A protein has these predicted regions:
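Bacterial N-terminal signal peptides that target proteins for export
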Residues: 1-9
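Long, charged/polar, soluble alpha-helical segments
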Residues: 22-152
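Bacterial N-terminal signal peptides
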Residues: 10-18
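General structural signal for secondary-structure boundaries
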Residues: 3, 18-22
Length: 152
């Protein structure tokens, strides 16, 4: 009886071992997961920055484009399951233009993360649309910076 139990336990261990080995393996597209995290952080910085109505309009455009970029990345099944409003802890930046500059910095980093070589034609299209939305968000945030500098 002990021999049967040991054999059964050994067989079960051998059956489960491959799954345990894959548990710590990084995902197929870790750069996209980093991009999702950075997009959420940029979104938070834009949405939690008090500003003038003209600047806020540009921030709204940037936030909308960030949401669209997140949607494109998630359509590619590169979804970490987090809520769009979930973001990594962000060091509080008190000056109003500081958050805009940090958001632009993050968006440029995201562009680099997402713009990597892609083999799957379906995913290429999603990647290209995500990049378009990221670039639009970057331009809107840059316009918001210009509005702050020009006192608009």
């Amino acid at each position: 009886m002990k021999l049967k139990s040991r054999l059964l336990l050994s067989g079960l261990l051998l059956a489960v071992l491959p799954f345990a080995a894959n548990a710590d393996m990084p995902g197929k597209h870790p750069a996209y997961l980093h991009a999702l995290s950075d997009l959420r952080a940029a979104r938070w910085m834009l949405s939690h920055r008090p500003g003038d109505p003209a600047v806020s309009a540009q921030e709204d455009v940037a936030i909308t484009e960030i949401d669209k970029a997140i949607g494109e990345i998630k359509k590619a099944s590169i979804d970490d399951g987090k809520d769009i409003h979930d973001h990594p802890s962000v060091q509080e930046i008190n000056d109003r233009p500081g958050r805009l500059h940090k958001a632009v910095e993050l968006l440029r980093k995201v562009h680099g993360d997402v713009a990597r070589e892609e083999d799957d034609p379906f995913t290429k299209g999603l990647r290209d649309r995500a990049i378009m939305h990221i670039d639009e968000a970057t331009h809107a945030a840059e316009h918001a910076i210009g509005d702050v500098k020009n006192g608009r």
